[in-house]
Amino acid sequence: MRIRVPATTANLGPGFDSCGLALTLYLTLDIGAEADSWYIEHNIGGGIPHDETNVIIETALNLAPNLTPHHLVMTCDIPPARGLGSSSAAVVAGIELANTLAELKLSKEEKVRIAAEIEGHPDNVAPAVLGNWVVGAKLDGEDFYVRHLFPDCALIAFIPKAELLTSESRGVLPDTLPFKEAVQASSIANVMIAAILRNDMALAGEMMERDLWHEKYRSQLVPHLTQIRDVAKSQGAYAACLSGAGPTVLVFAPRNLANTLQTSLQTLEIDADVLLLDVEGSGAEVFR
């Protein structure tokens, strides 16, 4: 059996800790034969555990402690610590692993709830489970979210080789915002969401670049954001914004500009991969 979970981008600018979008990069987990102990082969390196302390296995065992150990093979196209939901993908893969092997028959809603409890909020895990675009909130321990189709557009991901830990990126954020600034930040997010629902990417893109919640603080850790935004906008893109906590920058553009933008971004003197992606519509899947 095979489990496949997509990458996700969170925030989309002003939709801080609320908006998430599934992308066509994947964590793939092949479930092999039963074994005496858990072992997971993977292509990540960097000290990621191979035993039951691995997040995937740990998550599965928290849900189903009596699972029979298996040999697992993980292939992950989602680079860690780049703002593309790698940890959320691992958590969701663990939930799917337990659900499959223990026949838990979890609903998608239950999967989102469990994953959001582990991750703290639903912005990455909800689109990883459900696919497409999700707007969510966690209030008094309860998850509220809406899944909707994202407008058709090209997505160009500028993924630096250097990592940026979420904890470091969150560390530069202020504890509070002045009331008037928070009201303005909220109104910007509201207009962005309304524009997306109306398939108006031009207006949505303008709002994406006017975030007041987090990007101006995180830009000190991601100095290439302004440079990429200038290049993208000069060539007709809708917007460029941080993917999650960064350092990845995601460019939204008309499809006919995708290749030109990719080429232009590849010429920047920053060590990075520049990938053409799409919105992933299905979310986590199990292939039997």
Curated annotation (Swiss-Prot):
CC per GO annotation: cytoplasm
Chief localisation class: cytoplasm
Class of this enzyme: transferase
Keywords from the UniProt entry: Amino-acid biosynthesis, ATP-binding, Cytoplasm, Kinase, Nucleotide-binding, Threonine biosynthesis, Transferase
Disulphide linkage map: none
Domain of life from the UniProt record: Bacteria
Keyword Transferase: yes
EC number(s) stated in the UniProt entry for this protein: 2.7.1.39
Residues engaged in binding ATP: P79, P80, A81, R82, G83, L84, G85, S86, S87, S88, A89
GO MF terms held by the record: ATP binding; homoserine kinase activity
Catalytic activity line of the entry: L-homoserine + ATP = O-phospho-L-homoserine + ADP + H(+)
Presence of keyword RNA-binding: no
Alphabetical list of InterPro entries matching this protein: GHMP_kinase_C_dom, GHMP_kinase_C_sf, GHMP_kinase_N_dom, GHMP_knse_ATP-bd_CS, Homoserine_kinase, Ribosomal_Su5_D2-typ_SF, Ribsml_uS5_D2-typ_fold_subgr
UniProt GO BP: threonine biosynthetic process
Pathway(s) this gene product operates in, as recorded in its UniProt entry: Amino-acid biosynthesis; L-threonine biosynthesis; L-threonine from L-aspartate: step 4/5
Gene3D superfamilies registered for this protein in UniProt: 3.30.230.10, GHMP kinase, C-terminal domain
Function text: Catalyzes the ATP-dependent phosphorylation of L-homoserine to L-homoserine phosphate.
Family, per entry: Belongs to the GHMP kinase family. Homoserine kinase subfamily.
Official protein name in the record: Homoserine kinase
Species of the source: Listeria monocytogenes serotype 4b (strain CLIP80459)
Lineage summary: Bacteria, Bacillati, Bacillota, Bacilli, Bacillales
